[in-house]
């Protein structure tokens, strides 16, 4: 879907981006990760030509973006920034309708799209369409920013640290909301971040930047389990093995209670009818599960599906054994 080929950007004698190449498949979320000033945002802005490359090429769906009209290109790509960038003198509805209006959409069609998108980003259209940005919280503004980026149904979205200015509690919730939206709309997303946990949580693939170059490109698990250099290992952190727990979910290691020597009682619908020390959801990542087990002082948890039906038990020993086994395998491969 997106192919970056030998991309460079120089400002006189200063090289901001040097010979960057990678590919992102349709429907993937690719996080451009790295410290400040490493070329992440410059690379992102060369994709929609807010910054013109010194050399190299960007292809979207097989088309060389240098051969496209820059304004038309930008209108065909969703763009979300940390500062949100909503027009303060325009209502939420008018903000969302900016690109559809520029593309000549019928006014009624644009308004229907605005209402539809607010519902997608979990904002009640009857309450928020006529509000102004100053009447919204930071998290609500960010959701409207995402809705605006989706307004013309672009195949590609570029996001420059979109959640960086939001407090940690709301940021985690909005990340979850964005992932839910992405499962629904299936866009190809390039996402700038310096937050390792955010990259691990959200990315299908990660481009780790260092001083204008890509140090390593791969899945979050690749970077955590098999860092390609000392820089990659240091950047991913000394706790990178624990970070891998975010990539695994409770359901994946839930085992039969009887086989684990644990007695539980179920009702006729398969729901728990007895007390258990801890309940976790099938989709909870293993870092959440392990943290909850330690907080509760228990070595196991009951794993439940979205309908509260019992799936099995998650043993703390299985979490640790699974992680250790994967780590040993990763070391042997390297």
Residue ranges and their predicted role:
Residues 48:
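Helix-to-loop junction immediately C-terminal to a conserved catalytic motif
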Residues 108-127:
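Conserved ABC ATPase "signature" region
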Residues 131-136, 140:
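Conserved ABC ATPase signature
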Residues 151-155:
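A short, proline-enriched helix->beta-strand linker immediately N-terminal to the Walker B motif
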Residues 211-212:
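Conserved ABC ATPase "signature" C-loop
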Residues 217-218, 226, 313:
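ABC ATPase "signature
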